[in-house]
């Protein structure tokens, strides 16, 4: 993939990630003045995950690093705009949730219950379930680490 194609794919990924970020921000009753920042943060998070995955990192570590970036930027923006960091960060990480792998794991579980045990279905179930669980764990831990680092009151040593 050339540089121009990558930049177009990145722009498309960021624009398409901003839409559900705004949608979930509206569901969570985020103030109207913060909606554009939720969209921008969702685009930054998903775009940074795409850049990390393109550079060779797997999806779990890419999601972890992107959610740490979202958490750090959200804390900084909360100081500037006098809002809680969750106003910006929670809606911004929702586009990174593992819908496809969770859905595939669920479908494999349903097929196992209908058709009986099959080694290939069980491998599909476990692989996708572990991937989805790892991504959700990476999102939650990565989103909470910047707050633990930046709001720490005691000395680090």
From Swiss-Prot:
> Where found in the cell?
Cell inner membrane
Q: Which UniProt keywords apply?
A: Cell inner membrane, Cell membrane, Membrane, Transmembrane, Transmembrane helix, Transport
Q: Name one Pfam family in it.
A: ThrE_2
* GO BP terms: succinate transport
| Membrane topology qualifier | Multi-pass membrane protein
Q: Where are the transmembrane segments?
A: 8-28, 50-70, 87-107, 129-149
Q: Matching NCBIfam families, A to Z?
A: PRK09917.1
Q: Which family would the database say this protein is a member of? A: Belongs to the ThrE exporter (TC 2.A.79) family.
Q: What does this protein do?
A: Involved in succinate export with YjjP. Both proteins are required for export.
- What this protein is called in its record is Probable succinate transporter subunit YjjB
What is the native source organism of this protein?
A: Escherichia coli (strain SE11)
Taxonomy, top ranks, is: Bacteria, Pseudomonadati, Pseudomonadota, Gammaproteobacteria, Enterobacterales
The gene name reads yjjB
């Amino acid at each position: 993939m050339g540089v121009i194609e990558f930049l177009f794919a990145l722009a498309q990924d960021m624009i398409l990630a901003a839409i559900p970020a705004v949608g979930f921000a509206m569901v969570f009753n985020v103030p109207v003045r913060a909606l554009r920042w939720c969209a921008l943060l969702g685009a930054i998070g998903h775009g940074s995950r795409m850049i990390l995955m393109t550079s060779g990192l797997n999806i779990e570590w890419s999601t972890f690093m992107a959610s740490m970036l979202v958490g750090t930027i959200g804390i900084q923006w909360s100081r500037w705009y006098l809002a809680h960091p969750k106003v910006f960060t929670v809606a911004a990480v929702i586009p990174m949730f593992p819908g496809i792998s969770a859905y595939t794991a669920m479908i494999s579980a349903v097929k196992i219950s209908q058709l009986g045990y099959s080694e290939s279905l069980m491998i599909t179930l476990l692989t996708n379930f572990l991937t989805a669980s790892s991504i959700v764990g990476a999102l939650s831990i990565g989103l909470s680490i910047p707050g633990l680092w930046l709001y720490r009151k005691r000395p680090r040593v």
